[in-house]
């Protein structure tokens, strides 16, 4: 015959707890709390709950909608967020995914449409955007993409039509637009060319019809039209 020991975590209402210099205690107790703290509103509905060990958040942390559905879940280690945070729509589908490491966003964060398709995804390093950032139409077709370095646009930036065709392409350096921006018709034909220098229009700007004929031409110097 075999036997098993069942372990049940202690569960206490948040109203019975207090925080002293980042360490949680239960009123009337001298030992830092280990167990689950639950915040319940005046209607008796669970709003949030979190795991604690030795007075610090260690384990899951969850937030709930008024209907009882899970709204958000995250993981903590010694009061510091660590791991993948997931936020949910009220119907239970994932709304956000945000990776944390030592309390800072680290990795690829994603936001979703209610239909489950990715809306936006961006890469973070040490809580700062660094890498590719992309957005999508609700159909799943790429809407935009750009390169970000240390929180600033640095490299190409492209916009797309709902049919997937390129609509515009530009270049940035430390958040400042440089080089030639090209805009396109949905057919793929060139629509306009505009030169940028240090974030200002500089040079000859041209607009085209879909046959490729120049229909407008203007010259700029340091952002000011000169011809």
Model features per residue range: what roles?
Residues 4-227:
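Glycine/tyrosine- and acidic-biased, solvent-exposed loop/turn segments at the edges of beta-strands
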């Amino acid at each position: 015959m075999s036997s098993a020991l069942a372990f049940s975590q202690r569960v206490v209402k948040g109203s019975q707890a207090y925080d002293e210099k980042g360490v949680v205690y239960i009123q009337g107790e001298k030992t830092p709390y280990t167990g689950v703290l639950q915040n319940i509103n005046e209607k008796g509905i669970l709003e949030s709950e979190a795991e604690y060990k030795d007075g610090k958040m260690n384990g899951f942390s969850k937030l709930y909608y008024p209907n009882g559905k899970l709204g958000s879940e995250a993981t903590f280690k010694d009061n510091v967020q660590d791991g993948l945070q997931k936020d949910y729509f009220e119907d239970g589908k994932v709304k956000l995914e945000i990776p944390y490491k030592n309390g800072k966003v680290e990795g690829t964060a994603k936001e979703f449409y209610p239909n489950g398709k990715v809306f936006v995804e961006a890469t973070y390093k040490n809580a700062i955007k660094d890498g590719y950032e992309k957005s999508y139409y609700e159909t799943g077709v790429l809407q935009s993409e750009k390169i970000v370095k240390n929180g600033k646009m640095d490299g190409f930036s492209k916009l797309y039509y709902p049919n997937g065709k390129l609509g515009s392409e530009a270049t940035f350096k430390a958040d400042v637009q440089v080089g030639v921006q090209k805009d396109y018709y949905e057919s793929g034909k060139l629509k306009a060319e505009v030169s940028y220098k240090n974030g200002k229009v500089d040079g000859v700007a041209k607009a085209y019809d879909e046959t490729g004929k120049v229909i407008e031409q203007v010259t700029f110097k340091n952002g000011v039209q000169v011809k």
